[in-house]
Structures are given as structure tokens and as C-alpha cells.
Amino acid sequence: MWIYLILMVALVIIDQVIKAAIVSHIALGASTSIVTGLLSLTNLHNNGAAWSILEGKMWFFYLISVIALIVMGYLLWRLRGKWLYEVGISLMIAGTLGNFIDRLRIGYVVDMFQLDFINFPIFNFADSCLTVGVIFILIGVLRDDSFEK
């Protein structure tokens, strides 16, 4: 269980360091191409969710974050010993914490990764942790034979 706590802390630190670097090196709204036509770094302040849904509804995000962290903490404890679930939930907790810290500390989430080849919301490292965490959990569900009984 300790390894997952270390993983979560490391991922939250990485998320916060990336966000601090973006804010200090890229002007708000500016963009820098990393791989032409593929990936740019942008400094975007997001006080909503993807596609700006629920923009400005911070109370909602605070509430959902706290509830999600409680539920995921319980599931992490309940599903201990099933490594795919443990990794997935740990990634999701780290992602939730990374964005929750932003909302509490500065009132918005810093997003930076822009996919230039598709119309997709700009996202951050914490969002990536959430997405990869969901993938681990889906793989765990597909491989878990206890659901077949």
C-alpha cells in the first residue's frame, strides 16, 4: 500500500511542478509549439471542466472532488491486492488532488497540453493521470473473473 501512496505523492508533485513551470515561462494565453502540428504548450486558466462546462461553479468542483477522494480512498482500501485497480485508483486520486489543489490555491486549474491535430480541450498532467487511471481500472474489470459469477 505504501508504494501507491508514494506514487500518488510523486504524481501530485510532478503535476504542480509542471504547472508552476508553465505559469512562469509561458504568458497567459500564449502557446509554444513542441512538435509542429502535434503538440503545443499553452498557459490556460480553466475555472470549469473540459470544454468550459460548469465554468465558475467552484463549489461544485470542491464538493465533487471531496466526494470522489473519499470514494476512491475507500475503493483503494477495499480492492487492495488487485494491482490494476490499485494503480488505476492511485492515478485517479493523484489527478483529482492535483486539480483540487489548484482550485483551492488559485481558484482555477492550469492547463497546458494542446493537441494541435484535433479539436480537443487543452489539458494538464493531472487530467492525464485521471485518464490513464480509468484505463487501468477498465483493464482490471475486463480481466477480473469475479464479475462473471
Swiss-Prot record:
Annotated metabolic or biological route of this protein: Protein modification; lipoprotein biosynthesis (signal peptide cleavage)
User: Matching InterPro entries, A to Z?
Assistant: Peptidase_A8
> Which gene is the coding source of this polypeptide chain?
lspA
Q: What does this protein do?
A: This protein specifically catalyzes the removal of signal peptides from prolipoproteins.
Its name, as the record gives it, is Lipoprotein signal peptidase
Q: Which GO terms describe its molecular function?
A: aspartic-type endopeptidase activity
Has UniProt tagged this entry with the keyword Membrane? yes
Under HAMAP family, the record lists: LspA (MF_00161)
Taxonomic placement? Bacteria, Bacillati, Bacillota, Bacilli, Lactobacillales
Q: Which residues cross the membrane?
A: 24-44, 57-77, 81-101, 122-142
Q: Where is the active site?
A: D111, D127
Q: Which NCBIfam families match?
A: lspA (TIGR00077)
The species is Lactiplantibacillus plantarum (strain ATCC BAA-793 / NCIMB 8826 / WCFS1)
Membrane topology per the record?
Multi-pass membrane protein
